[in-house]
Amino acid sequence: MKTPKTLPEVTLSWEISADEITAILAGSHSNPFAVLGVHQGGDAFVARCFIPGAEEVTAMTLDGGFIGELKQLHADGVFAGPVSLAKLQPVRYRARRGDAEWAVTDPYSFGPVLGPMDDYFAREGSHLRLFDKMGAHLIKHEGAQGIHFAVWAPNAQRVSVVGDFNGWDGRRHVMRFRADSGIWEIFAPDVPLGVAYKFEIRGHDGVLLPLKADPFARRSELRPKTASIAAAELEQVWEDEAHLKHWRETDKRRQPISIYEVHAGSWQRRQDGTMLSWDELASSLIPYCVDMGFTHIEFLPITEHPYDPSWGYQTTGLYAPTARFGEPEGFARFVNGCHKVGIGVILDWVPAHFPTDEHGLGWFDGTALYEHEDPRKGFHPDWNTAIYNFGRTEVVSYLVNNALYWAEKFHLDGLRVDAVASMLYLDYSRKHGEWIPNEYGGNENLEAVRFLQDLNIRIYGQHSNVMTIAEESTSWPKVSQPVHEGGLGFGFKWNMGFMHDTLSYMKRDPVHRKHHHNELTFGLLYAYSENFVLPLSHDEVVHGKGSLIAKMPGDDWQKFANLRAYYAYMWGYPGKKLLFMGQEFAQWSEWSEAKSLDWNLLQYRMHEGMRRLVRDLNFTYRSKPALHERDCEGEGFEWLVADDHQNSVFAWLRKAPGQKPVAVITNFTPVYRENYTIRLPSAGRWREILNTDADIYGGSGKGNGGRVQAVDAGGDITCSITLPPLATIMLEPEN
């Protein structure tokens, strides 16, 4: 054993008062940094520590140099004594109990990691890299490697990080409070990556709360476990610069966008019924989407959530890809794989509300921190969830940073923002007296408006390749217009009116459709008021609504014919496209998150025909500029037949500057119509580029033999065409 150095005369007390020892042992001391660790008085230094189970403790420098033997002040593990140091520095202890010996690096001997500017920007709400500061990060600090933990809990009396590394003992790593920001932090030396942890919080009233998961955790345990996991920084080698450059430099409104909406846990499953990993999904889902011609995959929420039947919409970990499909690196590999073949990835993102699971954000520090305290603003009656407090800068910053995190760290191409209408209206799903008017007496949630505007400004300002899409079900104006023009700033908005009206029409027996012609024509009155996405989403095939094929009237042949005609009608209609998985091959059953899609149906001609049709629709839409370049501008659409309600026929022209127009003609009755006269913009031969009644799609094979002839009949250019039953055809001039 080394000979102890001569210790300087101590000019400060190295002992600890009985009250403070009691508080440390009880876990009620709010600032152990003031007591434990290394402290200086003049030229003298003392070290104090709390090491449960130790009978003897020796203090050392980080490189192992002896600096003093500490005296036991309490049998439960409190030690203190003078140490021989030239300056304040971190120390390590060698603890002994009987024959057992172990080393402990003192977390209280390290200085803070965060600085005053972090406090300032965090409090102001303008910190745009909180995800690099908050949560758990492996760093090297003052000569030691460990995990830096940081969490916002301004009203807590005490916050500790607990986990595998300290036996889940909240007395061991009590965090340092930063009064200027309300953030608690601690550097935990020698703690490795991969450990499970939570925060133990004593609320403002002194009551110990249930253990909380880390709001900024980048990885979580697999349900039913709920702890956060200290994750490494992503080390993905990205190979997608060409993909990102394309979307940075193009007007997304004038690009073909056809989105395949996917629930990652039920698209396909293993033979034993378990979920695929990200790498397994990549090997099958990516080539499938490439073959099908989709431009984007939109995932239902993949952020961590405890309850499978919530489909991810009740998330408890906004920064953590769910552990159901493996580690976060797997998701990064999946996105990279998509980008290498030109497929974009969109995340269904839920900033409107969060669940009240005890390990989540609810009453995080014993107060309504992330939510409103008044349930008239802070509780969502439809979903029994808490509503974010959009008037609090730290909460808005948490959400905006999360959007930036997904764009930067995972290279996501878009965010589909869920439940925007519930955010915009204070009286959403509330009766009279159950809501609080805004400062002007109205029902608009002005705080949510400002949040959404700020979100879009930040996203488009830092990641111009990303698009934001609003699921907004009302007529709120200018959802997809720029903020500087008074809009919310979204890139696109779901056209819920199109979905509702067209499905209402399609469910009707064809004999009655002539009485509801306006259900399909009305939508063109507002089709260009926003930049629309036409959604046939998961919402339309759950909760007893039946699948899309099951909604169609008639016998099986008519059901398939109706759906084929409807799909081509939609792909020819102005707006970007979205289709939920399984509907591309007309799955009969409603979607269930608990099992795979019914892929066995593809062995049957009608289902395989539907899949081939959707594939051809995608490639036709993408290859014909007239069908996509003016999706969001009225100049790209011209009615050809709008008022033939008697025959339930609709026809229009899709156009783009300098490009061949495409005529879209739909017959929504089972009547085979020959010699139907239609006006066209130019004489000559027009080629039938798509016919949903083709035999290859499962149809009857009726049509125009591939071409029609338009003739100039004294100023009016018309052609006589054959309209197959329950079918849509598309025509394009040959020259």
UniProtKB/Swiss-Prot annotation:
Active-site annotation: D418, E471
CDD domains listed in its UniProt record: AmyAc_Glg_BE, E_set_GBE_prok_N
Keywords: Carbohydrate metabolism, Glycogen biosynthesis, Glycogen metabolism, Glycosyltransferase, Transferase
Enzyme Commission designation: 2.4.1.18
Pathway named in the protein's UniProt entry: Glycan biosynthesis; glycogen biosynthesis
Enzyme's top EC category: transferase
One GO term describing the cellular component: cytosol
GO biological process: one example: glycogen biosynthetic process
Catalytic activity of the protein: Transfers a segment of a (1->4)-alpha-D-glucan chain to a primary hydroxy group in a similar glucan chain
Signal sequence bounds: none
Transmembrane segments: none
InterPro entries: A-amylase/branching_C, Branching_enzy, GlgB, GlgB_N, GlgB_N_E_set_prok, Glyco_hydro_13_cat_dom, Glyco_hydro_13_N, Glyco_hydro_b
GO MF annotation terms: 1,4-alpha-glucan branching enzyme activity; cation binding; hydrolase activity, hydrolyzing O-glycosyl compounds
Quaternary assembly: Monomer.
Family affiliation: Belongs to the glycosyl hydrolase 13 family. GlgB subfamily.
HAMAP family from the UniProt entry: GlgB
Function: Catalyzes the formation of the alpha-1,6-glucosidic linkages in glycogen by scission of a 1,4-alpha-linked oligosaccharide from growing alpha-1,4-glucan chains and the subsequent attachment of the oligosaccharide to the alpha-1,6 position.
Protein name (Swiss-Prot/TrEMBL): 1,4-alpha-glucan branching enzyme GlgB 1
Gene source species: Rhizobium etli (strain ATCC 51251 / DSM 11541 / JCM 21823 / NBRC 15573 / CFN 42)
